[in-house]
């Protein structure tokens, strides 16, 4: 960034770990980051018609956030959300959420042996448009009269480095069960307003509607699907010790 905070240049290193950029003379602030390492920041002064080098930059391994203690933890719905995004007529994105859900995480001594179970009330789907929500609850989509819940049981926790995890398990939706992996960023531990311990994470997954036989479709005159074939699911979760 330059002296007034504007981003001037960015990018990655070459295969040998070098990064070169041509910038006007002036004062700059530099930030270097890499997955699993603490960011490096420095100031640099570039003189007119000269080469400025920072030399070798060494990144320090980042300390991973503290993990939740072994035991049972509940999803705290007031400060959690389960949302989704779908494409509409190949252009806009429609955002929605489920307003009612519950879940428990059993943290093992070996964190990778942990397990979680989440139950979502299918009828609580909400896109802020009543007519659309009624259609999503109908047999064309979730068919909530026959399949009142969506359930995820995750039993494979794999550490991918830094604060990144993969949680793999079985998702049951619309009477069909498929293996799904949640790409998860663990955000660490904190304390709530009453001093209670909390842990938090963000997770995403991409679902293909046809995998769960949610296959209703209408085409526009040009052959463009009204509803896209994939759904992006986004979770922001806080957990508290069960008690």
Regions found by a protein language model. Give the residues of each.
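Low-complexity, acidic/polar, glycine-enriched regions of mature
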Residues: 2-243
